[in-house]
Regions:
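Extracytoplasmic surface signature
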Residues: 1-170
Length: 170
């Protein structure tokens, strides 16, 4: 979030509940954290920050054990605008937001990270803004501001089955 304290403790935008009190996670983030998700044993955070803890991490970072890590090397491979949603689907991290680039690729609001590299999927068009990603059973649902997804009419809500898009309800 945007919070910087809990009671008398300094907690910069990321906190954990230990069963009785809130505690900071290292030094927190230097700007807004919008979304958090678990992917395996790693805790991923997305937002509009440029560092988490002592790590440069433009818009996306993960916590493994007791340390923060950047995804894809931090600054040179960061996200160029806000991340609004994260989902772990088919052993990959999916990100949605207002961005147009991740790493060195064009990605109009939607991309995935396989642990080694970024890729796009489903042919999003410029102007696509993704606000929410949700995994249900074997499908990834995508909500946002768009009229088509992957060449099909899908006003603001679409379903990805791992290989193809369909309009919600189809």
């Amino acid at each position: 979030g945007t919070f910087t304290s809990s009671g008398i403790l300094t907690i910069n935008r990321i906190a954990r509940w230990n069963g009785s009190v809130w505690a900071e996670l290292e030094e927190g983030a230097n700007s807004t954290v919008r979304v958090v998700t678990l992917a395996g044993t790693n805790l991923y955070v997305g937002g509009s920050f440029s560092s988490v803890g002592t790590q440069s991490a433009y818009g996306l970072a993960y916590r493994s054990g007791s340390s923060w890590n950047s995804v894809a090397g931090g600054t040179s491979n960061g996200v160029n605008n806000l991340i609004t949603s994260l989902a772990y689907y088919n052993n990959e991290l999916y990100i949605g937001g207002l961005f147009t680039r991740v790493g060195n690729i064009v990605a109009n609001g939607l991309a995935k990270w396989n642990g080694t590299s970024w890729s796009t999927f489903g042919n999003t068009i410029p102007g696509t803004v993704i606000y929410r990603l949700f995994v249900n059973s074997s499908d990834l649902y995508v909500g946002g501001f768009f009229t088509t997804m992957g060449g099909i009419n899908a006003r603001n809500l679409a379903r990805w089955n791992g290989t193809a898009w369909s309009a919600f309800g189809a």
